[in-house]
Amino acid sequence: MKRIVVEASASSANLGSGFDVFVIGLNDPRDSIELIALESQESEVNLNYKNGYVVPGIDATAAGAVAKAVANQFNLKYKIIVTINNRIPIGVGLGSSAASSVATAVAMNRIFDLGLSDEMLLSVAVEGEYAASGARHYDNIAGSLLGGFRIVHQMPLNTVGFSPPLGMTIVVVTPEIKLPNRKTEYARSLLPKQVNLDKMTKNISFATRVVAGFAKGDIAMIGSGLEDSVVEPARKVMIPWFDQVRDSALQVGAAGVFISGAGPSIAAVVDGQKIDPGRVQSAMTKCFADHGISAKGLITTVGGGARIVEEQ
């Protein structure tokens, strides 16, 4: 018997203008998976949650899809049992499916000594995103696997990474609202099919400020680039009172605010050496509450990435 436990971090994608390109890994929360491999005459994958609930149709789940894809690709004759311990809220724009996918890919790579590079792990893990959302997008996968701020280039697949500036803090607030089924697919369906040249120019300007801010270690510059002329205007209709919540965070000192992934979570970047992140969180949750919507908040930092916790 082989056994391994791997953790992978939550992530927050897009950062305004960087749709499907920008992502940050978060130090908290994190999902973990336990993977047990038993020698067998054929390849078999079983998926469980920590409470023992067995999930049917593993092809429709991120972790199960990754485990099965790797087993098939490398002709692994094992019974593979994957147990997921979810700590990342599911379906709120924090990369829960990416974290499960990444943790499973890292576990399979290590336990079977496959020698996969980071780019190959990204290619394997993205199959879980495809199973979960119907699209192969690498941003959350990169943030969950590698951590930090990542710029994702898909053809050929590679990433460029930056460490966060000292004091950079992320406040995430998630409203408790009704969401459509297969939310990510629906959120993508809202996007415009054509983009005005002026809007594209603005977005390039915003995106370059984010990159320059990370390169210079300038939180204020990063915050000034967390704007979007294309995707956020189309998607914010899914989040009641988004503009008001955004303004409430900026008024108490947040450097910038953006929709985390496909939402409904909203992320604020704060210079924790100058501004109390708790004050920003309170302003955002209060704004939702003033409009009759409950919201949960968390304060975290940029970092994350996948790591092996136990191995035998």
Which ranges hold each PLM region?
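Short beta-strand segments
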Residues: 7-9, 25, 144-146, 153, ...
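Short, well-ordered amphipathic alpha-helical segments that serve as non-catalytic structural scaffolds
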Residues: 61-73, 207, 245-247, 283-284
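Gly/Ser-rich oxyanion-binding loop with an adjacent helix/lid
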Residues: 77-158
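Acyltransferase
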Residues: 167-247, 251-252
